From Swiss-Prot:
Sequence similarity: Belongs to the SmpB family.
GO biological process: trans-translation
Alphabetized PROSITE patterns for the sequence: SSRP
Taxon lineage: Bacteria, Bacillati, Bacillota, Bacilli, Bacillales
Superkingdom of source: Bacteria
HAMAP family, alphabetized: SmpB
Keywords: Cytoplasm, RNA-binding
InterPro entries (UniProt xref): SmpB (IPR023620), SsrA-bd_prot (IPR000037), SsrA-bd_prot_CS (IPR020081)
Function: Required for rescue of stalled ribosomes mediated by trans-translation. Binds to transfer-messenger RNA (tmRNA), required for stable association of tmRNA with ribosomes. tmRNA and SmpB together mimic tRNA shape, replacing the anticodon stem-loop with SmpB. tmRNA is encoded by the ssrA gene; the 2 termini fold to resemble tRNA(Ala) and it encodes a 'tag peptide', a short internal open reading frame. During trans-translation Ala-aminoacylated tmRNA acts like a tRNA, entering the A-site of stalled ribosomes, displacing the stalled mRNA.
Organism: Staphylococcus aureus (strain JH9)
Name the record gives this protein: SsrA-binding protein
Keyword Cytoplasm: yes
Residues of the signal peptide: none
GO MF entries: RNA binding
Amino acid sequence: MAKKKSPGTLAENRKARHDYNIEDTIEAGIVLQGTEIKSIRRGSANLKDSYAQVKNGEMYLNNMHIAPYEEGNRFNHDPLRSRKLLLHKREIFKLGEQTREIGYSIVPLKLYLKHGHCKVLLGVARGKKKYDKRQALKEKAVKRDVARDMKARY
């Protein structure tokens, strides 16, 4: 059974935790248009296959799909446009340095509201190999079996 989202969580990238080893996380604000935030609050955002990258000293989130707002008529947004992330220069520089190493990328893990503002939890990640994924699934199954046995004892 899937975990329930916390009240502020609007979208989660569960596939990222399966495909990547997350080494570091950082919170960033995101620049949105009016119809985008309305659509996000309805739960119409998808973080799958999205990534962040540094362009000209600024951080952008690419491939995040936000469905068009139904009541948005002609003022609706482009669902897959690049969205600017709000970070300090030193944070952008640090993330840029980490991603210059081969095999590292920045993936969004969660989209949530904090004090009425939309935030993105970014993770500096290294891709897992197929055997790493299998090993992680085996460890998860063992933990589940142990927990089930402990529960049955008491």
